[in-house]
């Protein structure tokens, strides 16, 4: 199929836009299913250098439309002017667009190196494997990785399809979306009736699984109730030293909410959870320490709370950690977890030596020191693992808690920094998949939303509205057993990496010089 360049360019831009529109707050998940194939079609038999541009523009479009809230965070809370904030969003979009650019370049290269007939098959078979391989690379490369809004999350709108994540992780769902899209493109390129029939049958099977699959997903019966307190503190770029004293009336209100909810829950001992530091909470603050211990004692159970934990290192220098702490019913500290995966430009400044301007972004909190272990805590009914905010988007890291014996997952987060943007809904969408991958109940407590209880199959069992100071009586249970994903990790994503290399090598091995020579001499479409 020969398309003019303007049509190819429009396909590339539209594919990026459709992929972005499949996520909150646009909420058109079906738009993701044709997106990858549209980019394949744009690059098929095109010059690799030009396809590199198509992929790059696809990526820039996708990020500008799907994570525009980065501009809001940087401007309102990062102490930077609007122009610099917009520049940071643009720089992130340009940097991450490298991954779809590589995808587009490879598809074009394979389709031009092989003779007609074979090239369409190879390009479309390679497509889902390479797409997943590059999403996996995005999870770890560049600033510690940014696997936000991976393609597979669009498929999680279907409870039935979502269950695949327990075997392959989120990457299997990305593969499913990309593979279907590529099959349809192959039907278009091949023009053969048998391929169209295969595409139609696949479409029917996906609709059946997507719509009817939820009826086959078993129920999960909870036996416990936790009290998740949504603190709803407004975010500020600066916090005065007397913040606790100034806000003591609000803290006392939260204490009443926490204690009364625990006493009324009928759960003995109870579990009260507060989110990731919504304000400058620290046990170096005597007033806050007294308040936290009082909540634990009066609730008659355990109290999990996010704090800034200050400690001296070997040289005597004070260092801060983003920490979750568990207090027992006597007010004693029984468990500590330090956040291991920090937010670049939010909790630390990468490449500080070169990016001197970025120090302003963490001026209000200083750099955090990352934790070094995925330790689990103990509750009367079993063991739990708690991951903090940004860590929810990294499947392999959450998996570590289950491997270390966690029977319950707890995610505490402060999404107040995102304002009323799409980010909190996107964050919940991704955290929900961690419950399925690990087959564990997930308790998610946030400062201003979305606070929810998610069962091991991805159902949101209970939640409360955003921007409200209240508590959620959240059902949960402790679960045993390990899913294939927990046992074997990112095996599917790594398989896609190997398959991508294998298909590219095979494509070059299949090359017919005379066909390649003819195409090389042919006139470029335009």
Residue ranges with predicted function:
Residues 64, 145-148, 221-225, 268-269, ...:
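A structure-centric signal for secondary-structure junctions around beta-strands
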Residues 1-215, 419-420, 431-434, 446-454, ...:
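Membrane-embedded alpha-helical bundles of multi-pass enzymes
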Residues 20, 105, 228, 324-326, ...:
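Conserved hydrophobic/aromatic beta-strand scaffold that supports enzyme active sites
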Residues 157, 235, 312, 333, ...:
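Flexible, glycine-rich phosphate/dinucleotide-binding loops
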């Amino acid at each position: 199929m020969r398309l003019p360049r303007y049509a190819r360019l429009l396909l590339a831009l539209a594919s990026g836009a459709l992929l972005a529109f499949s996520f909150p707050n646009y909420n058109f998940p079906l738009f993701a299913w044709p997106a990858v194939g549209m980019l394949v079609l744009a690059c098929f038999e095109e010059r690799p250098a030009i396809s590199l541009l198509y992929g790059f523009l696809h990526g820039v479009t996708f990020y500008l439309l799907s994570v525009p809230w980065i501009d809001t965070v940087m401007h309102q809370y990062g102490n930077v002017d609007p122009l610099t904030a917009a520049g940071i969003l643009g720089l992130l979009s340009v940097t991450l667009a490298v991954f779809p650019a590589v995808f587009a370049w490879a598809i074009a290269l394979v389709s031009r190196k092989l003779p007609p007939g074979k090239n369409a098959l190879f390009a479309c078979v390679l497509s889902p494997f390479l797409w997943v391989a590059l999403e996996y690379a995005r999870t770890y490369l560049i600033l510690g990785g940014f696997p936000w809004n991976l393609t597979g999350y669009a498929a999680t709108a279907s409870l039935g399809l979502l269950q695949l994540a327990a075997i392959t992780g989120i990457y299997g769902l990305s593969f499913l979306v990309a593979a279907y899209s590529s099959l349809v493109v192959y039907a278009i390129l091949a023009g053969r009736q048998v391929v169209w029939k295969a595409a139609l049958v696949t479409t029917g099977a996906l609709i059946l699984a997507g719509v009817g699959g939820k009826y086959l997903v078993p129920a999960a019966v909870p036996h416990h109730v936790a009290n998740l307190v949504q603190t709803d503190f407004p975010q500020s770029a600066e916090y005065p030293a007397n913040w606790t004293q100034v806000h003591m009336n609000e803290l006392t209100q939260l204490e009443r909410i926490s204690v009364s909810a625990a006493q009324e829950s009928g759960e003995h001992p109870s579990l009260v959870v507060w989110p990731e530091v919504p304000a400058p909470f620290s046990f170096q603050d005597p007033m806050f320490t007294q308040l936290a211990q009082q909540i634990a004692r009066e609730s008659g159970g355990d109290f999990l709370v996010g704090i800034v934990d200050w400690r001296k290192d070997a040289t005597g220098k004070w260092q801060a950690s983003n920490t979750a702490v568990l207090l027992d019913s006597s007010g004693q500290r029984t468990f500590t977890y330090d956040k291991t995966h920090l937010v670049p430009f939010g909790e630390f400044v990468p490449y500080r030596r070169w990016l001197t301007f970025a120090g302003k972004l963490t001026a209000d909190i200083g750099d955090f020191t990352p934790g070094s272990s995925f330790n689990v805590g103990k509750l009367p009914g079993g063991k739990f693992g708690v991951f903090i905010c940004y860590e929810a988007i990294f499947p392999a890291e959450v998996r570590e808690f289950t491997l270390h014996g966690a029977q319950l997952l707890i995610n505490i987060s402060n999404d107040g920094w995102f304002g009323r943007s799409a980010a909190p809904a996107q964050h919940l969408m991704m955290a929900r998949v961690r419950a399925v991958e690990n087959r564990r109940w997930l308790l998610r407590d946030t400062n201003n939303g979305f606070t929810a209880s998610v069962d091991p199959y991805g159902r949101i069992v209970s939640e409360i509205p955003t921007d409200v100071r209240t508590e959620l009586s959240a059902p949960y249970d402790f679960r045993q057993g390990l899913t294939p994903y927990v046992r074997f990790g990112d095996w599917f994503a790594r398989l896609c990496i190997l398959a991508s290399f294998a298909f590219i090598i095979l494509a070059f091995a299949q090359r017919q010089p005379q066909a390649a020579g003819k195409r090389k001499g042919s006139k470029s479409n335009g």
